[in-house]
Amino acid sequence: ALLDPTTSLWTQMGNPFHDFHYIGNDEAEKEKLKRLKQDWSGISKQLILHHKDYDHLDPEILCEAEVTDGKITIGNASYSVLILPPITNIETAAWEKIKLFLEQGGVVIANKQLPYESIEDELIEQEILDTFGLDQSTRSDYWKAFQGSYRKGQQNAYFIPSGDIEILLHVLKMHDHEEIHFETESGKKSFLTEKRKVSEESTLVFVSNQEEGKHHATMRVSYPCE
């Protein structure tokens, strides 16, 4: 699942009723909002282009989710990996749920920016930094486009300062063992895939080519098919 940076966009004066368009009058603040939105949509787009199934997860819904056996469960959906886009803050209740998820074996991959703003009475920045194995705030590095590999903190908490998609895919591969894998011989990213497990015995896979032309592709399934 990919966490929505809802409250981070709010604090940068993004209007949630109009696609988080900026409603303030500070150019620096406007640029920060633009950067947060671009990075969030960028992660989303790259996950789609690399055929990684995911759902968007609102922090308020996360607060109500059930966390057991290293999975976040919401209705019929469950997630073993939670990806955090760059965020400047997070609600305490959502952070408590993330901590529980990590304690139970879940995987959390944060990108570029960890929360540093306080939107509630409780200060949690240092606890978040400790969880991801960092000794200082990431706020200045993000706005300066810091580059680097990744840091593994407590349990399965990862922080990728550069937000490099290849590093994100590498960490995902370490923990997310795909039952169905699709790739083209040419490496073209014009294909979109959607996988839905309808029962323990049945999985539906939809593949669509968004461009013209023929391509050779391979689909691998990790279990016997009839």
Predicted features, each with a name:
Residues A1-E226:
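Carbohydrate-binding surfaces of carbohydrate-active enzymes
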